[in-house]
């Protein structure tokens, strides 16, 4: 079991009940990856199926969304293969805003 904090910033909170910070307990047996977390987010936290495409494209985080693992770009940490540790902070920030 892993407890993580997930942040939805840059307007992404709009598809997550207007709540920017969520504490998530992943009950899956170790190891739990960021990919597992993303699957959990999509299957349990996005209420409107039409909103999935705002967050996911081609089975990954949509381009234009910066993903950080403990303030480090997820590309440097192995992206979806990163193994979550208790207390990790995962941030998703949309860079695509209305003007």
Swiss-Prot record:
Localization per Swiss-Prot or TrEMBL: Cytoplasm; Nucleus
Note: Present with 1240 molecules/cell in log phase SD medium.
Coiled-coil ranges from the UniProt annotation: none
Modified residue annotations for 1-thioglycine: 99
Family annotation (Gene3D superfamilies): 3.10.20.30
UniProt superkingdom: Eukaryota
Covalent link Glycyl lysine isopeptide (Gly-Lys) (interchain with K-? in acceptor proteins), residues: 99
Residues passing through the membrane, by range: none
UniProt keyword Cytoplasm present: yes
Protein name: Ubiquitin-related modifier 1
SUPFAM superfamilies the record matches: MoaD/ThiS
Keyword Nucleotide-binding: no
Function, in words: Acts as a sulfur carrier required for 2-thiolation of mcm(5)S(2)U at tRNA wobble positions of cytosolic tRNA(Lys), tRNA(Glu) and tRNA(Gln). Serves as sulfur donor in tRNA 2-thiolation reaction by being thiocarboxylated (-COSH) at its C-terminus by the MOCS3 homolog UBA4. The sulfur is then transferred to tRNA to form 2-thiolation of mcm(5)S(2)U. Prior mcm(5) tRNA modification by the elongator complex is required for 2-thiolation. Also acts as a ubiquitin-like protein (UBL) that is covalently conjugated via an isopeptide bond to lysine residues of target proteins such as AHP1.
């Amino acid at each position: 079991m892993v407890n993580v904090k997930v942040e939805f910033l840059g307007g992404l909170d709009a598809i997550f009940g207007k709540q920017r910070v969520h504490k998530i307990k992943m009950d899956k047996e170790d190891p739990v990856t960021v990919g597992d977390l993303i699957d959990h987010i999509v299957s349990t936290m996005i209420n409107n199926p039409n909103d999935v495409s705002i967050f996911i494209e081609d089975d990954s985080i949509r381009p234009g969304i910066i993903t950080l693992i403990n303030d480090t770009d997820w590309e440097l940490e192995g992206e979806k293969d990163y193994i979550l540790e208790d207390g990790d902070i995962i941030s998703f920030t949309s860079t695509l805003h209305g003007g």
